[in-house]
Amino acid sequence: MVCGGFACSKNALCALNVVYMLVGLLLIGVAAWAKGLGLVSSIHIIGGVIAVGVFLLLIAVAGLVGAVNHHQVLLFFYMIILGLVFIFQFGISCSCLAINLSKQAGIIN
């Protein structure tokens, strides 16, 4: 059975957002696990990973609610946020490629 129109897009968007929610929960869980076992000593790194996990989880929930309810404003907000995240990731990737390893180590420290 083939789905067409918005039904197929809705199902694909719901599945994608469920995967994003699982990734967000995984990030939060791994950060808590690493902190509990003492694998990572920097609270800033743990906090950053948890913040990214929570952000991803919230955005995925917004996308899932928008797709299920066919809420156009929420889907537009979701699209804008994902576009900004893409631009941010692209900028960080270009920055990482532009500097060498010694400068990267200096920035991290």
Curated annotation (Swiss-Prot):
What cellular-component terms does GO give this entry? membrane
Q: Which residues lie on this side of the membrane: Extracellular?
A: 34-44, 94-109
Tell me which UniProt keywords the record has, alphabetically: Glycoprotein, Membrane, Transmembrane, Transmembrane helix
Does NAD show up as a keyword for this record? no
Q: What is its main location?
A: membrane
- Tell me the residue ranges located in the Cytoplasmic compartment per UniProt: 1-12, 66-72
Q: Write down the InterPro entries for this protein, in alphabetical order.
A: Tetraspanin/Peripherin
What name is this protein filed under?
Tetraspanin-31
UniProt source species: Sus scrofa (Pig)
